[in-house]
Amino acid sequence: MTSYALLHTQRVTAKNGEVFTISPDLWERNQQQQSLLLRYFALPLKEENNRLWLGVDSLSNLSACETIAFITGKPVEPILLESSQLKELLQQLTPNQMQVEEQVKFYQHQETHFEQEDDEPVIRLLNQIFESALQKNASDIHLETLADQFQVRFRIDGVLQPQPLISKIFANRIISRLKLLAKLDISENRLPQDGRFQFKTTFSDILDFRLSTLPTHWGEKIVLRAQQNKPVELSFSELGMTENQQQAFQRVLSQPQGLILVTGPTGSGKSISLYTALQWLNTPDKHIMTAEDPIEIELDGIIQSQINPQIGLDFNRLLRTFLRQDPDIIMLGEIRDEESAMIALRAAQTGHLVLSTLHTNDAISAISRLQQLGIQQYEIKNSLLLVIAQRLVRKLCSKCGGNLANSCDCHQGYRGRIGVYQFLHWQQNDYQTDFKNLRASGLEKVSQGITDEKEIERVLGKNL
């Protein structure tokens, strides 16, 4: 009987006293991970209820368990074995290969090279990251090279949440793989780069990713902005506006000309508010044009254009062209400078309804911001119909009610987000805010049991 066959009956006792029966069949079932297991000096001991028990010789090798868990999609339980015992078992499982020490050195040496034939673990690892991000509804994926680890974090409902750490030996290959997907220069790690690519999930969903790289002290950092390429429900009720706010917004949207601004920081939901307004306005008798960076949601019946600064196609050039295209409604992704502000105001004064965004903390600050961009007070009064300031707050989880129950997969007490709003509109020869500021709007959501005061404080701070 060969040493390989003897493994069918061989038992191994872990340092914690637990006894395992070694299964070559389990080793064979993990064939795609064998080079990875040898690289980490690790041995699969048992698989049960979709959980994998992994033998290692040191708790410092926990990153191996986390990486293999990511690749296999199974929780991994680390089991400490004697180093000599682990070496003997691995050697019996690979009798026709080089000595275990040489195999470990060989596979670890391979980590310094990006080789196509050894891409499978990296591809599986990235696929698992993408699938996990989709399942958790993450808007951004952060991949960060640290001193000893490669950190993965997902931004879920506006909050960064750490994911299992990955061994740093994968860092360069993951980064190179992502650069290949985004058609970037793999060899350039001294300068930031930006790119895009698509990923098809197990369930045939298409994810669009915007990729940004950044050189750091320990290596490159990558941030991926995820966007699902599928229909999105756009309705005022989903935004979280009150009935009065919805009606006020729709009344202003029904005006033939003027400027409507949505304000707030990055990630406050401004784009969704604009898309919802455009969808409500979208009828066959209206010519609607948008200038965006990038196009986040595709809307049938609307002419959407994306800026391309590399060839000189910026917001200002698109806006000037739009005015020669006989539009009824124009959406400008963002008013960024004096020129775009002037063009937007002139369009709003000459028979067009213009929608855009500004980065200001509240509604009233939008007026001073326009003045800083060179717009005169009388021009603002003649054109500006409505300013909506907004934020997104997390909703209490409908399963656990925010009680942070361990059995709930939200793990944070929250699931999903909803908007809180402040309206500033022209009324009786002056601009008037509606009766709610952002905090009052948020506290109303608290009284309705939608969110809690801690979340309002997190989003708004103490000054709003």
UniProtKB/Swiss-Prot annotation:
<dbReference type="GO" id="GO:0016887">
    <property type="term" value="F:ATP hydrolysis activity"/>
</dbReference>
<dbReference type="InterPro" id="IPR037257">
    <property type="entry name" value="T2SS_E_N_sf"/>
</dbReference>
<protein>
    <recommendedName>
        <fullName>Protein transport protein HofB homolog</fullName>
    </recommendedName>
</protein>
<dbReference type="InterPro" id="IPR027417">
    <property type="entry name" value="P-loop_NTPase"/>
</dbReference>
<dbReference type="Pfam" id="PF00437">
    <property type="entry name" value="T2SSE"/>
</dbReference>
<keyword id="KW-0067">ATP-binding</keyword>
<feature type="binding site">
    <location>
        <begin position="264"/>
        <end position="271"/>
    </location>
    <ligand>
        <name>ATP</name>
    </ligand>
</feature>
<dbReference type="GO" id="GO:0005524">
    <property type="term" value="F:ATP binding"/>
</dbReference>
<comment type="similarity">
    <text>Belongs to the GSP E family.</text>
</comment>
<keyword id="KW-0813">Transport</keyword>
<dbReference type="InterPro" id="IPR001482">
    <property type="entry name" value="T2SS/T4SS_dom"/>
</dbReference>
<dbReference type="GO" id="GO:0005886">
    <property type="term" value="C:plasma membrane"/>
</dbReference>
<dbReference type="Pfam" id="PF05157">
    <property type="entry name" value="MshEN"/>
</dbReference>
<dbReference type="InterPro" id="IPR007831">
    <property type="entry name" value="T2SS_GspE_N"/>
</dbReference>
<keyword id="KW-0547">Nucleotide-binding</keyword>
<dbReference type="InterPro" id="IPR003593">
    <property type="entry name" value="AAA+_ATPase"/>
</dbReference>
